[in-house]
């Protein structure tokens, strides 16, 4: 075992001051003595680097992992803690002097005194060199030796011009033909290199770096020391194939250990570099095969120079570009992502029939641009069922890189391509299968995607199918989709357990998506039969599911839009559909100026439905700021499965929320929402259904709504739904709700159905349908539309399963034992209220523990259960400073408890203070009717703290000062206060 102490030579450093275009400056080498210490940057790699400048000298330092060759024997890897100028090397061999030493050992050829200089070099960050790239030699008769340099460095400093892309490579050519790579003999005693090789006079340095316009980047190209008779030619090529060539003429001597610095250059292209030219399918296959085998550097440029017609190439003969572990052409690895430039030059890919993407995978530094996949191309994605796979007609997987100005009009058919049922998720995109962290811009997919009924999944594995019109999956915060479009239609009949379909992207976890548009239609016709694993279908005009998670995951969606229709002809157990996204299950996403104009339609008897013009369901805390008219399409819900567990949640903007959500801004909904049922009384059973112009239902969590306007149409058929809520703004809330500064002019109607049902109730309101389970605040809201419920509930309204209708809200706290307070303040209704077999109020149909102040009603009421100008039924409430100018009439099919009051129809433990009524009260027979309260219990009173006034007629009898006290409260119970005659003048 031998140990050598080796001091390093030092490399001179020169300034760029007085350089001219055709000259280099140089300084003499200075040597540093001492022991060398090396550090490791990446495990298993050597790291010999240039140290910091010491005047005009930069020492070359050993680093951990370095190895030398002594008399053809490699030393052990150096194991030291920090960079230094000398080091002890150990060799596991008995060697005799003299000792010929070469560094690095990896360059030594077959234990000889010959080294191989690579024709490819890599740039490194800063003004430095890649470790292990600067060869040295030494010679000694003792165990201590001093190393000398064999090469010099050509220093190139570059700045970006006005239109500079990422720099692919720098190519240095010895114009006189001197060899700069290949095999060189080493004279270790005199530190000299010699070679007789021909045609190896070019060195390429891979750069893969964007330049700055402010400061120059330094690139150090290592060349054999010697005389270069005609100087050098330097070519700089960017990712777009733009080239700049600078010639350094005359005889130049590059001395060992010298840094020769070119004048600073600004990249100004004066040429074009096409690289590998591809004009035929055969040339494509040849290029892809060679690249996949590692025969091209990552700085390579390839250009498609003619349309490629693959009609004579069978699917099993086509070679995809790049390799992805688990994909067909690399099922068990390794992966090799394309990292070069592929310039499609606007050419078409024609008649390609394949089960793999045109490009399988791209990675860091890749640029793919101007490629058009023609409509004559068709794809049937391959998968083996064992590893997650992504498929796009252009690219399967984008790890990183750039994709620009590409299109696809291909057809993609997802079917059972393999005998093994799929056990892992499959991501399909019209253009891109999955975008991790690439920048994709200006691309269009008009690809048609069909997932037929033969695509089934392993029922035990419970796998998912993701289909996006443009891409299947966006998964990294560094990923970008900008100005991308999908116009292709998607049709799904698969029975995968979970099916996710989005017009732009199926699964969206992170990234920035800006200015993207979908106009492609989505149609699902999956037929559910016994034993099928399919349970959930998620359909989104832009995205199926948005599920960003993790500390660094975040999604930004900016100025995107959908106009593609969503149609479900499936009887699936659960459908979630949204014009922007089916499901929003993260609070790490923001949406700015994103809209939907597409229609949402269901036709088959599905069981559970979550549907919204923007979002089908929101299951994470969210703050949304909406403005303008974010949804202009229609929502048309057809028949649903008759099942006592069925649930329906549909909203003009949001179907259902299950987390705390705040919606604010100044948005207007002007569309139509309809639920049409053609069934008998025995059909259409459901547990609950909620419909609203803005939101269907806030379920199990609070919701805040402000500044929203509803100006559309809501038309609902209901039969045997245990609980239903319909509202111009929100259908229902199960944990309280805050609503402020909202208005409704949408006609809200629950249509007449001849079938009579027992105990299946509907609550309808101009702003909200049914709110329970939490504190309620409704302030500064208005309704001007007709609120109509013709649902025939054969049960009495008073048993907490009756119908309720209100001009502002149908019911608040309509549950036995309610303990939550409600505030309704400064709300006004000028629309009419019609309720068959239900309690009705000009402001609220039923309210518990409410405080109502400063409200007014100027429409009219027709009802067949308790009705009041402010509240149909008030339980434990305080009503003050409200006025009503309206008629209250009785509808057919009335009940015996259709009490009628100008302010409150029926009051339980409630007070009415400072309120006024003027109008016509037309009660049913044998009911209590009063100008202020129709029926009051002993705990209720009117005009206690301030006086109440009323006037008009009661059952045709004019109200006068003589009969005020008689007509103030219709029942004999209740405390009378002070009343005055009011003529309706405000």
How would you name each of these model-derived features?
Residues 269-986:
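Surface-exposed repetitive/solenoidal architectures
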Residues 2-13, 17-279, 289:
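Sec-type signal peptide cleavage vicinity
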